[in-house]
């Protein structure tokens, strides 16, 4: 038993798969646009694709944009997957050309039939305009119809017989052109109103009359030159006629008409000019969408979705891709898609390694111009235009200022979905999540050691290269990280910022403090019990206290690798108050000991210790 809607269901399923990119095994490239599809579907309907895929297994097919336009191919692709051919007078010709190139015979036959019917509709609607005698030669008549293509026309007075024009229009019409009756009347109505304010001149009267044969020849010539927008030809002729008349009337009656009448005529003139511009230009745009209308108005284009204002219609079209999710620019190396062409160009540089923006002071290269600007502001003393209103600190980018402002406001919009901890930066949350997952994506090429933070890998790589960029200002000793330099600097100042909350011993390095707690107190719970026992014991039992720090003095060989934290000499002293009642967790200890560090530095500190 065969299901009646089986074929329709199959087409609908294939179309949904195409739209979502599921199982698509080929990509059609037309200029900067790409279309994903299935080879077997294309080969089933198109002789061109059948022959192409028979000889080649390439997944990317390049089509000539002159023969197959993106909008025309989109219409044909929708027809192949749905069976519905959506066309109008604007895109009919480009669909026909694309179908001929791709050898879709059924579509070609349909387009030819439609074009012939449109030509038949256009000729009668033009020949019924007005069969009157002509007092103008062919050049003058053409000038009156197309004043923009002719030379400057002197101010003349135009008068014509209203009754004859009406008589020509009210002639017999076929059933096919009844729909043109309404727009023709509207144009004649405008002419009738404009004729009331004309001035008659006895010296040089100029009579405009329309010859049916000449109009028919001009219509045929117009169709031969451009088969697009055939249905707009009659409206274009009427608008041009009225425009030429209105220009003459406005010039001849400029000194006698009232201001209100002048405004009305100017409005009519602008309306006709706008209509003609729409007719001649709208067919060249993508699919004649309504989004393109702002280009032909005096107001700036505005996005109907988010209200953003643009200076040009092309900018609005690119912006609309964001709302529609259209990403026509695809990287041929990794298949990643982008909304704009410049985004694709920047992305390709990640594959090629190209860095066209060079710093003139240090010859360092960058893939983006904004990266060069940021580098110059950060490292070469250029102006940092973004200033904090609270502490007057200046920043190179607005994003850095925004992140800094959260320190004053306390805002932490990024929340860990596992433990609920909040962070001020998205990157900090990323580093934090890696503590839960154990992910360490940054791997050393030399020894294979992995790190969760990129800065840790950079510092680690200096061990292999021997680079030591941080130099002590007192003894000129160099170190591989700023954290190691600050730890060394405490040997000159005698500072011991890390204090044990159990026994009160202080250390210059948090690693030494951690080692002390593991050796002497064996965990925070035993440390709390030991501390409470010390407080309750008498002076006679003072011998039960922890051994004196002879075993706490650490040699340089006992130290671990230094921290990779940037601590300037201006940072406040990192002192931890001693609590006699309860011990502190390692996380609380680290947070209290480094109050001036950013979240990424704090996470790195926790990971290392």
Curated annotation (Swiss-Prot):
Keywords: DNA-binding, Metal-binding, Nucleus, Repeat, Transcription, Transcription regulation, Zinc, Zinc-finger. Residues 533-546 have a biased composition (Low complexity). A motif (Nuclear localization signal) lies at residues 172-188, 257-262. It holds the Pfam family zf-C2H2. One of its GO terms (biological process) is regulation of transcription by RNA polymerase II. The keyword Lipid biosynthesis does not apply. It is found in: Nucleus. A zinc finger (C2H2-type) spans 301-323, 329-351, 357-380, 386-408, 414-436, 442-464, 470-492, 498-521. GO terms for cellular component: nucleus. One of its GO terms (molecular function) is zinc ion binding. Its main location: nucleus. Residues 24-89 form the BTB domain. Residues 528-553 are annotated as: Disordered. This is Myoneurin.
């Amino acid at each position: 038993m065969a299901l009646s809607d089986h074929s329709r269901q199959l087409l609908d399923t294939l179309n949904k798969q195409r739209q979502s990119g599921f199982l698509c095994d080929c990509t059609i490239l037309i200029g900067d646009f790409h279309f994903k599809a299935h080879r077997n579907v294309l080969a089933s309907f198109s002789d061109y694709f059948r022959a192409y895929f028979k000889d080649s297994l390439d997944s990317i097919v390049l089509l000539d944009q002159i023969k197959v336009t993106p909008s025309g191919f989109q219409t044909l692709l929708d027809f192949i997957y749905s069976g519905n051919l959506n066309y109008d007078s604007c895109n009919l010709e480009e669909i026909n050309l694309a179908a001929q190139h791709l050898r879709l015979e059924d579509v070609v036959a349909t387009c030819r039939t439609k074009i012939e019917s449109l030509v038949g509709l256009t000729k009668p609607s033009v020949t019924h305009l007005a069969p009157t005698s002509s007092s103008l030669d062919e050049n003058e008549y053409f000038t009156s119809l197309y004043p923009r293509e002719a030379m400057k026309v002197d101010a003349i007075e135009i008068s014509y017989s209203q009754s004859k024009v009406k008589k020509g229009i009210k002639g017999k019409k076929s059933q096919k052109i009844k729909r043109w009756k309404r727009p023709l009347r509207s144009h004649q109505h405008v002419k009738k109103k404009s004729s009331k304010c004309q001035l008659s001149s006895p010296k040089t009267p100029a009579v405009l009359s329309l010859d049916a044969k000449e109009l028919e020849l001009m219509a045929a010539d117009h169709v031969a030159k451009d088969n697009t927008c055939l249905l707009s030809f009659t409206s274009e002729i009427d608008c041009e006629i009225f425009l030429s008349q209105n220009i003459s009337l406005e010039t001849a009656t400029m000194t006698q008409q009232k201001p209100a009448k002048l405004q009305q005529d100017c409005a009519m003139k602008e309306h006709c000019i706008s209509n003609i511009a729409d007719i001649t230009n709208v067919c060249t745009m993508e699919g004649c969408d309504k989004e393109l209308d702002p280009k032909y108005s005096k107001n700036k284009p505005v996005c109907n979705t988010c209200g953003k204002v643009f200076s040009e219609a092309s900018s609005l079209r690119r912006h609309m891709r964001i709302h529609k999710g259209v990403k026509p620019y695809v990287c041929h190396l990794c298949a990643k898609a982008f909304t704009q062409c410049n985004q694709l160009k920047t992305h390709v540089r990640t594959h090629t390694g190209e860095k066209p923006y060079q710093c003139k002071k240090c010859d360092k290269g960058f893939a983006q111009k904004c990266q060069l600007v940021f580098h110059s502001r950060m490292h070469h003393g250029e102006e940092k235009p973004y200033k904090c209103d609270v502490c007057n600190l200046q920043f190179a980018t607005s994003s850095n200022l925004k992140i800094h402002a959260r320190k004053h406001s306390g805002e932490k919009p990024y929340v860990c979905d596992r433990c609920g901890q909040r962070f001020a930066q998205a990157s900090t949350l990323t580093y934090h999540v890696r503590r839960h997952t154990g992910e360490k994506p940054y791997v050393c090429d030399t020894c294979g050691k992995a790190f969760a933070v990129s800065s840790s890998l950079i510092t680690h790589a200096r061990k292999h290269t021997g680079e030591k960029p941080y130099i002590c200002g007192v003894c000129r000793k160099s170190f591989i990280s700023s954290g190691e330099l600050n730890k060394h600097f405490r040997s000159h100042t005698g500072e011991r910022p890390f204090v044990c909350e159990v026994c009160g011993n202080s250390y210059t390095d948090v690693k030494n403090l951690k080692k002390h707690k593991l050796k002497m107190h064996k965990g925070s719970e035993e440390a709390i019990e030991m501390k409470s026992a010390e407080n309750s014991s008498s002076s006679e039992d003072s011998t039960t206290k922890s051994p004196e720090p002879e075993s706490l003095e650490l040699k340089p060989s006992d130290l671990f690798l230094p921290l990779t934290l940037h601590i300037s000499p201006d940072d406040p002293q990192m002192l931890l108050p001693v609590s006699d009642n309860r011990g502190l967790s390692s996380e609380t200890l680290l947070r209290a000991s480094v109050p001036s560090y950013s979240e990424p530095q704090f996470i790195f500190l926790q990971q290392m210790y």
